[in-house]
Every structure is written in structure tokens, then in C-alpha cells.
Amino acid sequence: MTPKIFIILLTSFWLINSSQLRASSFIGETITIGLTASLSGKFREAGTQQLKGVKMWRDDINERGALLGKRVKLIVQDDHSIAEDAAEIYETFILKDKVDLLLGPYSSDITNAVAKVTDKFNFPLLAIAASASSIWDKRNKPYLFGTYVQSDQLMTPVIKLAAAKNLRRIAIAYANTRYTNSIAQGARRVAQENNMDVIFYEMFNTTNDFREYVERLAETKPEIIIVGAYLEDSIQFVKALKQHKVSPKMLVFSGSIDTDEFRSALGNDVEAVLSAVQWSQSQRLPGAYDFSFRYKQKNKVYPSYQAAGGYAAGQILEAAVRLSGSLSKKDLQEQLLKLKFRSLFGHYRVDSNGQQIGKKAYLMQWQDGERRLVMPKDLTNHTIRLFNIK
């Protein structure tokens, strides 16, 4: 054997064994990620979907070979859709569980409460589902990083489309939450900028009876109705519209209606209902088709945008950790501030305050019992259908 061949074999032997030693040294080591999920309470459906997305990312990354040589472990607690409960749990994650990383809960109100805790400990928090711009107003510390389109911009594309179609009379109904308030304020601003008449602008409290509310709305004879609401209120709202035979040309909800539960509750009455969403299953969006296929195989239903958001948050956090090369809170914060990344969800890019500025919103419509992407035009062949209560 020549000296050259011997050196090559010896080097190969050293590389193989050193890699095995490195791998074996991480056996039993994990990176822990703490998060709450709304597994009960008013956000149960969306919160459950979101957690399924996060868990799917965890399974994928562990199958690929882990993160920084360690397996990823989720520590999950039910926050019962209550902001105060979530805030207490996140403090426990930091002080008692000593988690390495954090992902945010579901909803703007709960995230806002949690961010006050994570700010106190200078702990970076990637918000999975928080879009109310007021969360980022007057923040002194850039430790909260958004992934959603800001809610006050969510209705901009559909309102501009309605104005282009000469629809002028707009009604805006919204639930009493930080997220839906922001949607309503943004919708009113954009409508006024496009010379539309805001003929109805009224908040409602969560209720199973919208009859009196819808009666007042019906008197204004709107051509387009914008509704800022979560799933259960959205279902009851459509039922009340049908009962009073209110039939605008466009009926648009803020989200949470792209689920099988919405379709099951309303049957054919979902036809032509629009929803401004953060993500769509369109095959023209990178990774969307593969994710949808695998998610349905695993969960027996197609993913909602909340599920996609959960998965994408994992992708973004993974990218930031890999690029920083450590679990240092300071390094992670700096990386999340400067990161430009394209996830399953779209473009991630934040301003100096951590507010999302890189992502765009999509418009989905129920057509023939199926979810169809109808905007933006460059991503779909489907056209918007006018709404008609039957």
C-alpha cells in the first residue's frame, strides 16, 4: 500500500468515526420549543389547526436530521383561548422549563399579552398568528416578530376590486377584538380613500344571535359587506343574513372560514363567500401543493391557512437558528430582524420594530363546495363570483 493511499484511508476512517462521535454525543440532547395552543375555547378550531402545522414541521425537521445536531421537542400547553392563561404559561416556559426557543400562540389578543412577558425577559418571540398592527405600536423592544400580513391591510385588495367594479355602498361589521378592530379600521380607511360610502360601521359582541344586528345592517342596503370575525361568529352571521334575505354582491370575511367546519355548518350557503386569507393551497405557490397533500394524508382534511402558518413559523425559526449557528437569544433576535426568507407561507421580512412587511394577502372564495384562490390574478385562473343568498 502506498503512503498516499494509506493517508487517504486513514483520513476517511477519521472522518467517519469523528462524525459518528459527534452524532453520538448528541444522543438524548434536544432543543426545546415552548408554545401554547388554543385547544379549547373560542379559538379551538384555528388553534388546533395551527398546532398541527407546527407538529408537522417538527416531525419533518427531526426526520431530516435535527437542528444544530439536536432533535426538536415541543412543549405545548392549552391556553384555553384566554390571554391571561397564556401569559402565565409563557413565563413558566422561560423561568421553570428553561425552554431554548419560543413560538407564539393563536390570535392577536393572546399574543399581545404573551409579548409583554417575553419582552420582560428579552426573549425573542416569533408570532405565528398575530396581525393587529397595534401590537407593534410604541414598542420599546424589538423582540416580537410577525409572520402575518398586518390586519389593517388585509382587506385592501378586495376593497380596491369592489371599487373598480363600481360597488360603492360598503358595510363593515366586526367583533370586539384587537385583530378585528384593526381589520375594520383599515377597511374603512381604504374604502374612504377609494371614494366608497361607508354606510354601516358597527362592532358586535360575540353572540349566537345576530338577528337584530343584521336587521339594522339590512336597512342600509349594502353592495359589499366586510366582516371581521372568527369562525363561530362567521357561521352565525351567514345564517342571519340568509334568514333576513340580505344579499350583497360581495360578502367578505376576515379569515377562519376556509375550513371544513365552516362548510359543514353551512352547506350550500358557503357558495361565493369570500375570505381574505394569509395563504392558499394554490399549486402556483411554492411548496403549497406538497404541504397540502402530505397534511391531508396525515390529518384526513386539507390544511387551513392557520395550519400552513404553523408550519411556516417552524421554517422561519429553523432558518434563523441555522444562520445564527446558536441558541443565543441575542443572536436569534438579530437574525430574525435581518432575515429575508421565503417559507411555505410567503416572504418573511420585518421592519426595525419586528412588524411583518414582506408578505402579501390572498383572497379565497368558496366555489362549488371547494376553496378557490381568486386573487392575486397572477396566481390563479379562477374569477370571483357574485354572492347571492338563496
Model-predicted segments: where are they?
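Extracytosolic ligand-binding ectodomains
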Residues: 6-10, 21-390
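Positively charged n-region of N-terminal signal peptides that target proteins for export
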Residues: 1-5
